[in-house]
Amino acid sequence: MRSIMRNFAGVIVAAAGLLSLASTASIAEGWPQNAIIRMIVPYPAGGGTDVVARIVAKFLQERLHQTIIVENRGGANGQVGLQALKQSQPDGYTMAMTSDSPMTVNPWVYKNLPYDPMKDFIHVTSVIRLPSLLAVHPSLPAHNIAELVALAKSKPGGLSYASAGVGNFSHLEAELFAQATGIELLHVPYKGTGPSSLGLIAGEVQLSFNNVSTLWPYVKEKKLVALAVCEPKRMPDLPDVPTIAETIPGFEIAPWVGIVLPAGVPKPIVDRLTTEILEVMKDPAAVKQFTDQQLVVMTLPGEQFTALIKKDSDKWEKVVKTANIKME
């Protein structure tokens, strides 16, 4: 009798396993199906992350034959949008296109962060690296990094820089530069990338770090001067702009944009979405739209993306603590 019962139990376990596999397969086959997909951008429209999201959404919906709506949910340096993602149903119909700052900087800047970047989200893949540029106002008597550092050291705190807000990546980039060169700069936070760029153009501040795609149009109009890029090597499209690393060896900043899902989304859906996004990022038409805006394709799916988030988080923890940057 016991032998019969054991055999019967084994049959039940095997059947349950088959049902589980069948259920998993049906989930993958059934997604997406007659439902709008939301892609949350935790920033206002018009910024670098938003631009990336709209390009990816356009090509992704063509592959999925499904409508994808880009939903801008800005506020608190990305907290509002990522909290909305955390609270969404883990069914694969809500994702977020986020920059690195809400994932790697916010945990060290904000005391009561409403999400855990490592536990509350599935890290699908990075998609883009956003090269950074250090630009200065034309009136500043510094034509290279060495002259800028010398000028700043001659009057500590006398030079000011614009950021898009406390804890924003443009803030952290400047702090890292100051720490690496031993200079003291005055931080002037603005409410967003647009206002910070306009403040620099107006001469309210002397310098600013931001995405090449954001600042380069003003450089071409001679409203700003490009001092250096934060890439490890000179950019092919900007061969005359030196890197900061040419003066400060090892100095590199590589902001990124990537896609995350709320924790709990079934693995078959995650795998399907990952596959489709990676195909989008190889599409020549999509790549051209990115390169036209000085955006560099960088795909690190799954565990590679998680490792990047962890590495950058450790890096910015040191910068934030050294600069004593805190927000309630």
Residues covered by each model-derived region:
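Short, low-complexity disordered leader/linker segments with a strong preference
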Residues: 1-34, 146, 328
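N-terminal (or domain-start) structured segment
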Residues: 28-119, 158-160, 166, 182-209, ...
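Hinge/capping helix and adjacent helix->loop/strand transition within the periplasmic-binding protein
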Residues: 31-33, 87-93, 108-195, 244, ...
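An extracytoplasmic/periplasmic, membrane-proximal ligand-sensing/linker region
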Residues: 33-36, 180-183, 220, 267-328
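Structured segments of extracytoplasmic/periplasmic soluble domains
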Residues: 43, 59, 63, 88, ...
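Extracytoplasmic/secreted proteins, especially bacterial periplasmic and envelope-associated proteins
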Residues: 51, 55, 59, 80, ...
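A ligand-binding cleft/hinge motif common to bilobed small-molecule-binding domains
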Residues: 102-112, 176-180, 207-240
